């Protein structure tokens, strides 16, 4: 039986060593996120300020896997 996971969107607030990031979810929870293998193999850069999709286990809601980096919404600079 496959483990059920929640998918959230959030904002990267801090970059930590070894592909780990501090992520503030849209519901204001602060969790630790790590980069999934596909993102790591594709050399996708994730920086503080990026919006991401993160998959959180129901058993440990303090850690999650970053599964997608969202595109910026046509920012007006």
Curated annotation (Swiss-Prot):
One GO location term (cellular component): chloroplast
Protein name: Translation initiation factor IF-1, chloroplastic
Keywords: Chloroplast, Initiation factor, Plastid, Protein biosynthesis, RNA-binding, rRNA-binding
Organism: Coffea arabica (Arabian coffee)
Keyword Signal: no
Quaternary structure (record): Component of the 30S ribosomal translation pre-initiation complex which assembles on the 30S ribosome in the order IF-2 and IF-3, IF-1 and N-formylmethionyl-tRNA(fMet); mRNA recruitment can occur at any time during PIC assembly.
Superkingdom in the source lineage: Eukaryota
Main subcellular location: plastid
Gene that specifies this protein: infA
Domain called S1-like: residue spans: 1-71
Function: One of the essential components for the initiation of protein synthesis. Stabilizes the binding of IF-2 and IF-3 on the 30S subunit to which N-formylmethionyl-tRNA(fMet) subsequently binds. Helps modulate mRNA selection, yielding the 30S pre-initiation complex (PIC). Upon addition of the 50S ribosomal subunit IF-1, IF-2 and IF-3 are released leaving the mature 70S translation initiation complex.
UniProt-recorded Gene Ontology molecular function terms: ribosome binding; rRNA binding; translation initiation factor activity
